[in-house]
Design a protein with these regions (language model features):
Chain A
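Alpha-helical transmembrane segments in multi-pass membrane proteins
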Residues: 45-53, 57, 76, 80, ...
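Hydrophobic alpha-helical transmembrane segments of membrane transport and translocation systems
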Residues: 154-206
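Juxtamembrane helix-loop transition segments at the membrane interface in multi-pass membrane proteins
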Residues: 16-22, 33, 63, 68-72, ...
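Juxtamembrane and boundary regions of transmembrane helices in multi-pass small-molecule transporters
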Residues: 123-137, 193-206
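Membrane-water interface of transmembrane alpha-helices in multipass transporters/channels
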Residues: 62-77, 134-144, 204-206
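Cytosolic regulatory modules rich in charged/polar residues
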Residues: 1-71
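Residue-level signature of catalytic and energy-coupling elements of molecular machines
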Residues: 1, 43, 88, 170, ...
């Protein structure tokens, strides 16, 4: 979350590296780019991120019934949302590095990696939930959510910086983007799968 | 979350900058440091982070009653936990930069900034929760949690890299540390304040 200051740092590192090749004796005037130590910019970032991330509360609110009936799902929300941010962040960094080196970036390739990661992460998330006396159906939902979140995160984490790069925007900004997107998408995926696996069968049974 | 790969990148950027001064014609053999594109290291990182972040589910599980009686608190968990990661991450980056430039880093100074940030973030979190038809007492808990989380995040985000630096460990690793710590601390703070504000008064009233 809020990797803006880090990506800014990366930008500058990248730019200073580029500068290095042209004229190593003349580094960028870095001090002029620094603003995080000022109260205004720092506070503005925090306010913006808080408001965007609060969208997650709207989604959860609209699935209030599901969450009340299956409390265990809420216990694993932070873990699952974190997984999306982590896996997506990894893909962004890999993509930014490959683009910087002029290497080709293929979403299909990262989708393949995402599917391989699912083979480890989904069973792990399921076992972790089941170990905590979580009912089988809810543990399976946690595992399935881990699978969908991992695949989505690797795709978004690759496609987003590639898209930014295509539109001449620094792909490093994808680091913030993927964290915010996967925070909200993660919540939506858990709620959606919860409805599909835990609520729908009960409705059909009636 | 999982900023390890980013801080690694920063480390290398820093090291290459240092190298620049000594011998600009001989950059570090960067390729040898790269491992994130390999399945093993990437998956190991994700597994480790998932297991650490799953501690949050144990805390929530032990406050199950509170969460069931005050569902609105769970809706704002992702937003509040995100705030801790964001504010803490900002402090880490500021501290790492100051240490790199040989400037003094004072936890007291960041505590002061944290208290100023609280003046904006706590009312904002309260209003955001209250706007969503959250009961007044729960909205106040969300606001109070935002306050405590913001102050904790700025302190931990400053003290952790300073501590790492003191023990000759790269302070940049504080970026991962603060995210994981504030994920878990954030959940604990919301649960603790929820118990204090929403459960204790009811017990005394009996």
């Amino acid at each position: 979350m809020a990797l803006g200051f880090l990506t800014d740092r990366l930008d500058r590192a990248d730019r200073s590296e580029a500068k290095e090749v042209e004229a190593p004796q003349a580094p960028l005037p870095r001090e002029s780019l620094e603003s995080l130590h000022l109260f205004g910019p720092r506070c503005t970032w925090l306010v913006a991120m808080l408001l965007v991330q609060s969208v997650s509360s709207l989604i959860l609110d609209s699935f209030k019934g599901l969450m009340q009936r299956h409390m265990s799902l809420t216990f694993f929300l932070t873990m699952l949302v974190g997984l999306g941010g982590n896996a997506g962040g990894q893909s962004v960094v890999l993509t930014v590095r490959r683009l910087a080196l002029g290497k080709p970036v293929q979403v299909k390739e990262q989708l393949h990696v995402g599917l391989l990661l699912v083979l480890v992460m989904a069973p792990l998330a399921f076992v972790r939930a089941y170990m905590q006396q979580t009912p089988l159906s809810e543990s399976l939902t946690v595992g399935a959510a881990a699978a969908v979140i991992t695949v989505c995160a690797t795709i978004v984490g690759t496609a987003l910086p590639k898209l930014l790069w295509f539109f001449n925007v620094d792909p490093a900004h994808g680091a913030v983007g993927v964290q915010v997107l996967m925070d909200i998408a993660g919540i939506a995926i858990v709620c959606g799968l919860g409805y599909l696996f835990l609520e729908l069968p009960a409705k059909f049974a009636k």
